[in-house]
Amino acid sequence: MGLLEGKAAVVTGSSRGIGAEVARFLAAEGAGVVVNYRQKAPRANKVVAGIEADGGRAVAVGADLTVPEGPAALVVAAQENFGGLDVLVLNASGGMETGMEEDYALKLNRDAQVNMLTQALEAMPAGSRVVFVTSHQAHFIASVPTMPEYEAVALSKRAGEDALRAMLPQLEEKGISLVVVSGDMIEGTVTATLLDRANPGAIEARREEAGRLYSVAEFGAEVARMATADVPSGHTEYVGGADYLAAGENA
């Protein structure tokens, strides 16, 4: 029996990349998983089909987290399909896309995260777990500068983390824990691709600095592990980038 047998999970931004890997890992542990997409239904349906082919349970749900009805739709989907909501993985993020409004990064990386958690709290019982996914470039932005092309996104993601941490007393009252997973640059993600396009050679330079970069599957496994890990609420799990940790401690 898996660690999440009979439980229900929502993974935001899970039609591809890290979120899709997290959804697969959680389903393999027995959870029924709501796979969230914003526009690309075929990608999400493919993730669901893969989970079901492996004997898991999942459903694809289209929801834009930056509008009020988006988070609510994901909570309802978890309740209607899997009987509740026990694990919430806040993976969706953005801000480097072209053609978006000026404040989109803050709307998605801070406001939408808070709105999603606020909606989820109504459905999550004591003992539930919330996992927020971020990057070292965002988590350590106050002490370690990042590349200019990513700075606005990093600041908005750090604002999101701070806003979620401000909810810790509210979570504690309900017996719900929050864990933050912070990772170095991850090979093969959309963000890494966009950064390398805006700043050619950025990925290779970071790889040389760090020694190695985690793959999407490796990082996804670490995020999924935090859904059941025996760690205190408010814990930050660092994945890769030892130089960031040293710089952050010395700042």
Q: Over which residues does each language-model region extend?
A:
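Conserved glycine-rich cofactor-binding loop
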Residues: 8, 15-17
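Rossmann-fold scaffold of SDR-type NAD(P)-dependent oxidoreductases
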Residues: 12, 85-93, 109, 132, ...
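Conserved glycine-rich Rossmann-like NAD(P)H-binding loop of the short-chain dehydrogenase/reductase
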Residues: 29-46
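The beta1-alpha1 cofactor-binding region of Rossmann-like NAD(H)/NADP(H)-dependent oxidoreductases
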Residues: 41-42, 62-74, 110
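A glycine-rich helix->loop->beta "capping" turn
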Residues: 54-57, 76-90, 177, 232
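Catalytic loop of short-chain dehydrogenase/reductase
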Residues: 93-99, 129-173, 185-189
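Catalytic Tyr-X3-Lys loop
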Residues: 100-121, 127, 131
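C-terminal helical subdomain
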Residues: 174-182, 197-251
